Amino acid sequence: GLNVFAEPVRQGDLTLVVESQGEVRPRREIIVAPQISGRISYVSPDFIDGGFINKGQLLVRVEAADYELAVVRAQSTVASAQQALALEEAEAELALQDIEDLGISDASPLARREPQLAGARAALESARAQLKDAQLALDRTAVYAPFAGRVRERNVDIGQVVSVGQSLGQIFANDVVEVALPLKDAEMGRLGLPLAFSSSKAQPGPDVTFRATVGGVEREWHGQVVR
């Protein structure tokens, strides 16, 4: 006869392994560029191809003399505008006193020196705005690293004249990297991932283990599918 064997079903965890390979890319990579023009007066010794940099580290400085002079001029303009406003306020006060003493009830705005006072106030606001612009330009003579990471390449040196937006080099963050892993439809199904998957706190992606040989040494990193 036919022998039939039965095995009780046991509930347990099953690990499905899908293998793939891809290129490691930094999540953040930017071109370092100045927001003002001028001659380079300083370059950090760490700002070299392959160099390590810290967040907030000074990478490059543009000669600041012209921008410092612009700030001094703007400060002088503000001081002059403040003095002019103070004089105009005094003149307006005297004009109002004269109008009151003469008993004039329908004095014109010009007689009350209202246009002159408004003009002096506007001149002061304009001078303050110019000072703010000059100070901002001076601050921008220093170019800092927005994050910690490494330098992919440097395109500038001391003495070089640069313009606004010119590439000084490229840096990338090394805290988080991304790897694009090509998967077949069947492999996506084994992982239980829809085609438009995007991880969230409620639905995190599956864990990923990366292995690579670096300098003859087998290394391993752990990550997670995010999209």
Predicted region positions:
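Short, compositionally biased
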Residues: 72-83, 181-188, 225-226
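N-terminal beta-strand block that forms a small beta-sandwich/beta-barrel module immediately after a flexible targeting
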Residues: 1-45, 130-132, 145, 155, ...
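Amphipathic alpha-helical coiled-coil segments and their boundaries
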Residues: 60, 67, 74, 99, ...
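Short, surface-exposed secondary-structure boundary micro-motifs
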Residues: 58, 64-65, 167, 173, ...
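Surface-exposed patches in structured soluble domains
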Residues: 23, 51-55, 137, 142-190, ...
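Beta-strand/loop subdomains of soluble extracytoplasmic proteins
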Residues: 17, 176, 183-227
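Extended amphipathic alpha-helical segments
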Residues: 16-19, 76, 80-84, 88, ...
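Short, Lys/Arg- and Gly-enriched loop/turn segments at beta-strand edges
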Residues: 63-73, 175-180, 219-220
